[in-house]
Amino acid sequence: MAELADAPDLGSGARKGVRVRLPPPAPHKNGGKNESRGSGQGSLFKALTVEIQGDSVKEKIDEMYKQLQKTVQIQGFRKGKAPLWIVRAKYKDYVEEEVGKKIADETLQKALEEANLKPVADVFLEKVEVDEKEGKVKYVVSFEVAPEFELKDVENLEVEVPKIEFKEDYVKEELERLREANAVWEPKDENEPAQEGDMLVVEYEVEEIGGEGEKVKQETSVILGQGMLRPEVEEALKGKKVGEEVELKELPLYDQEGKEVGKVNIKIKIKEIKKKVLPELNDEFAKELGYASLKDLEEKIREDIKQKLEKLKEQVIEERVADKLVEIHDIPVPQTLLRRELSFLVDRRLRELQALGIDTRYVDIKKIVEEVQPIAEANIKLRFILDKYAQEKGIEPTGEDIEAQYKELAEQYGTTVDEIKKYFKENNLEQVVYEDARRKKALKEIISKVKIKEVEQKQEEEKKEEKEEVKNESQGNT
């Protein structure tokens, strides 16, 4: 499902340049001349040229020279005693660059408002020119803006969702899951080969090819068949016995964007192979879990599943409506937002793998990027759609809506509501919470108006297959 919440800014950008903050505009003295011009109207990338002229520019330049005069050490003079004209000659380029950046910081927000431009992500300072004599600063910034699009008739959609019903088989499946969770690992005979589902205790040595030739030697545990290792590593380990070694030469490494960043040689020695042993399903097992009997355990499971199915219905409806909204709108995605979203999703996937005890240095990052890119694009499109709907319908979150959003964040990050509020306030992120709460409210409003049609699971699968066939045929004809 496309996600409503914005990905945090991890500092990624689509182009090189100086990242400019967007603080409140600073006042200018003596009616200084300010001028801004925007360009690039046919693209999401925009360039804005801003000219600032007045006494405030001259004052900032003079002030910086005087500060430097007091602090810099110039050969032939004691600290703070060099003539101002020498300081000006030596540090002219530095002062002009720093003053230009400072004035860009102070004036950019006002310039953007005058040009009626709203960046959706990072703003890059591409060029700064300072004329000390005229007291003039001219700078150029580039950034991306939100795409313009027409909102479709989202309130009269028909959305199909799979029919979700309680089945007694779910209780049996949960009991099996509990058995799996309470299983024990017992050593296999040394002559038995490793197979899928086995836990391997291995000692591995990784040697970087080229560079500094760094070597890493560690011991870890992995379960074959759970995607904890790259496919080629898993295949090499299958069928091996305790004491045997495998070697993989020139294995490529990838960064978070899927680009190859180097190669390594890996040597793995199997120290132990363990098999999973499941407990018997009886009253004794139920008592170990805190229930009087197996019957009591089954009843509790049944009750919990029914509650979860109700929540699942709501979640599936949200997902299908969100997917439908994205499907019916053709919206270009700003590349700066896409890079940020990709970085966030890849990082989150890596943290999930780390939580499972997986060494993410050898995970196929390129594959993860390919998997999450459609999700990243859908997330961004959905936010634009819900923002536009909320704006057109005048939807605003209440205090209760915002409080609920903070509560959800606190649960997500395993902390208190007060701590979350403190963090968002200190980092000037309160507007992000407000916008996420507004999007959530907009989606609920849309869901209340669309027609929800429940279909049997079999029909659902058949329609998915039909869509996939149509997609493949269209790709084959292009």
UniProtKB/Swiss-Prot annotation:
InterPro entries: PPIase_dom_sf (IPR046357), Trig_fac (IPR005215), Trigger_fac_C (IPR008880), Trigger_fac_C_sf (IPR037041), Trigger_fac_ribosome-bd_bac (IPR008881), Trigger_fac_ribosome-bd_sf (IPR036611), Trigger_fact/SurA_dom_sf (IPR027304). The keyword Ribosomal protein does not apply. Its main location: cytoplasm. Pfam families: Trigger_C (PF05698), Trigger_N (PF05697). GO terms for molecular function: peptidyl-prolyl cis-trans isomerase activity; protein folding chaperone; ribosome binding. Keywords: Cell cycle, Cell division, Chaperone, Cytoplasm, Isomerase, Rotamase. SUPFAM superfamilies: FKBP-like, Triger factor/SurA peptide-binding domain-like, Trigger factor ribosome-binding domain. Its EC number is 5.2.1.8. It comes from the Bacteria. It catalyses: [protein]-peptidylproline (omega=180) = [protein]-peptidylproline (omega=0). Belongs to the FKBP-type PPIase family. Tig subfamily. Involved in protein export. Acts as a chaperone by maintaining the newly synthesized protein in an open conformation. Functions as a peptidyl-prolyl cis-trans isomerase. This is Trigger factor. It comes from Aquifex aeolicus (strain VF5). The lineage of its organism: Bacteria, Pseudomonadati, Aquificota, Aquificia, Aquificales.
